[in-house]
């Protein structure tokens, strides 16, 4: 990525917006995985009561940041539909190598720790600001190589997107229907910007970059600042038996599928693999429902859009979060001694939901019922309480949709 490049065609701008959607999506999954790995109970060991409070704070911060990454994805979708595109929610499977994006930093699933926090800091690092001496020293204290830091930035990508919205004539660029834009009245994202012209597109970009990297005089209240503070706290708390994260395996998968790239590791524990497969199926359905809500004109079907968005967003904390946390309490299998499983965020093969709202609802209802039936079968097994809660919540949601 280089801000010396001129973006002056719709095609180039749409390509960049698709890249931004992939990045926001992948980074959100990486954050969630780290959050799932943080211990909850003192019985898990490795922390005192005081340290437990710190770990709980870290988990809350990471989940909040991940929710803002989903807001960023929604903003990118609004920018995309504003100029005639459609929401893009696919991405390469994990792990994504450093060379895949110009970030020069891999995007993968690994538990909370110095290595994952270093990656998160580099994802959110302010554009055009070289890692300063204090940050390099912090990386060194955390046991990471402080000198080999070569990376682009998400902010740089949004700089290119900004140039496209600035360079292409406004009257030619914004061809999308205004009633196709999602707003906070339809989906529970309070900071969602309706993109209808150049000014609102720039406002959406500013919202993303300010939340991620912060602004020059206030980095602390940004994703970048939050992750720097976490790494400082972790480095200073090292020793004395402090172990805040569960020993989850890196880049797990319910089943290994190379069709979308990635070199994930298959979970060998059959029950954990089934739970991970259920997680993937719920996650994929959630994305389909959200993408459908953003893709089609809301005129006359506002109630349907609100219902789709409400159910999709409800699946995140009530089903995906407890399943994800619970998987990290289940052994990964004999091939991974001492390691626990985790969700792979695998994208399952499926067709797009149809434009007709009634037919789309029928497909989603049927799929929810299928997944609820699978959850009922899994509930017969010995499972962590959080997994059981996620399965029961899925049944309730399926029966009320």
Regions inferred by a protein language model and the residue ranges of each:
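Non-heme di-metal
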Residues: 2-401
């Amino acid at each position: 990525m280089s801000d010396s490049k001129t973006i002056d065609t719709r095609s180039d701008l749409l390509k960049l917006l698709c890249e931004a959607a992939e990045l926001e999506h992948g980074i959100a999954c990486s954050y969630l995985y780290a959050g799932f790995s943080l211990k909850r109970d003192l019985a898990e060991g490795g922390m005192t009561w005081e340290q437990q409070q710190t770990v709980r704070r870290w988990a809350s911060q990471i989940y909040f940041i991940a929710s803002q990454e989903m807001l960023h994805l929604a903003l990118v979708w609004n920018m995309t539909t504003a100029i005639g595109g459609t929401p893009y929610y696919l991405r390469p499977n994990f792990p994504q190598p450093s060379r895949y994006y110009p970030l020069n930093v891999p995007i993968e699933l690994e538990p909370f720790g110095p290595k994952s926090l270093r990656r998160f800091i580099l994802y959110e690092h302010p554009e055009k600001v070289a890692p300063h001496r204090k940050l390099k020293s912090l990386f060194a204290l955390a046991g990471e190589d402080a000198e080999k830091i070569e990376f682009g930035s998400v902010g740089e990508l949004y700089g290119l997107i900004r140039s496209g919205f600035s360079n292409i004539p406004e009257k030619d660029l914004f061809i999308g229907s205004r009633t196709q834009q999602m707003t906070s009245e339809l989906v529970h994202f309070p900071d969602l910007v309706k993109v209808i012209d150049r000014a609102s597109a720039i406002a959406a970009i500013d919202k993303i970059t300010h939340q991620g990297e912060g602004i020059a005089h206030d980095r602390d209240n940004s994703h970048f600042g939050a992750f720097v503070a976490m790494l400082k706290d972790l480095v200073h708390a090292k020793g004395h038996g402090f172990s805040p994260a569960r020993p989850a395996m890196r880049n797990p998968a319910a089943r290994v599928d190379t069709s979308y790239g990635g070199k994930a590791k298959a979970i060998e524990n059959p029950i954990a693999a089934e739970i991970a497969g259920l997680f993937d199926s719920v996650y994929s359905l959630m994305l389909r429902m959200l993408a459908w809500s953003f893709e089609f004109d809301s005129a006359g079907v506002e109630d349907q859009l609100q219902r789709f968005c409400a159910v999709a967003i409800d699946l995140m904390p009530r089903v995906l979060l407890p399943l994800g946390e619970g998987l990290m309490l289940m052994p990964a299998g004999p091939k991974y001694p001492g390691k626990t499983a985790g969700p792979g965020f695998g994208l399952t093969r499926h067709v797009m939901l149809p434009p007709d709202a009634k037919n789309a609802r029928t497909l989603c209802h049927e799929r929810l019922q299928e997944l609820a039936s699978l959850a009922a079968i899994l509930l017969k097994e010995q499972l962590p309480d959080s997994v059981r809660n996620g399965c029961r919540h899925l049944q309730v949601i399926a029966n009320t949709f």
